[in-house]
Amino acid sequence: MSNYRRDFTKGGLYFFTIVLQDRTKSYLTDYINEFRSAYKQTCEHYPFETVAICILPDHIHLLMQLPENDDNYAIRIAYLKTQFTRQLPKECRQFNKNRQKYRESGIWQRRFWEHLIRDDKDLANHLDYIYYNPVKHGYVEVVKDWPYSSFHRDVKAEIYPEDWGGNPDLKIKGDI
């Protein structure tokens, strides 16, 4: 058993990877409006700043800035998962006995990857990783063509050029 201990830093900037249980499903993009609604509800109920996000068919990459006196990212992730699952059609929500016992939905992996951003270089690497991910997985050939990403917001803010190509060799811990 792993001795991994999660970091809890008040006001921390965290990178998350949140993954569907069945990686062959594309619920996150098939039901993008439901995801957006669940995300909005989560932000309203448990405020945080979205520094960057990329929604892929079977997983999400998210850079979340917590409020100054708050370290509870887990409640935000759990709430997002719950709200999205509730909005899915019933046939998508599969439950087995063990998951019912722990009040878990069958669509999500139980755990998620979390990483506290340490410095500006770490932040830049994670931003690049998030935005290049749809290209890495073969969903698009260029970053700007992926519609489910905050990349477009960052282009408008002149943080990234629209023709930014990414770094195909960039690897980060927790790469999926």
UniProtKB/Swiss-Prot annotation:
Alphabetical GO biological process terms: DNA recombination; DNA transposition
InterPro entries on file: RAYT_transposase, Transposase_17, Transposase_17_sf
GO MF term set: endonuclease activity; metal ion binding; sequence-specific DNA binding; transposase activity
Pfam family name, one: Y1_Tnp
Keywords, comma-separated and alphabetical: DNA recombination, DNA-binding, Endonuclease, Hydrolase, Magnesium, Metal-binding, Nuclease, Transposable element, Transposition
Active-site residues annotated for this sequence: Y148
Gene3D superfamilies: Transposase IS200-like
Listed cofactors: Mg(2+)
Binding-site list for Mg(2+): H59, H61
Quaternary structure and partners: Homodimer.
Family: Belongs to the transposase 17 family. RAYT subfamily.
Functional summary from the UniProt entry: Transposase responsible for transposition an insertion sequence (IS) element. Transposition occurs in 2 main steps, excision from the donor DNA 'top strand' into a single strand circle and its subsequent reinsertion into the DNA target. This increases the copy number of the IS.
Protein's name according to its UniProt entry: Putative REP-associated tyrosine transposase
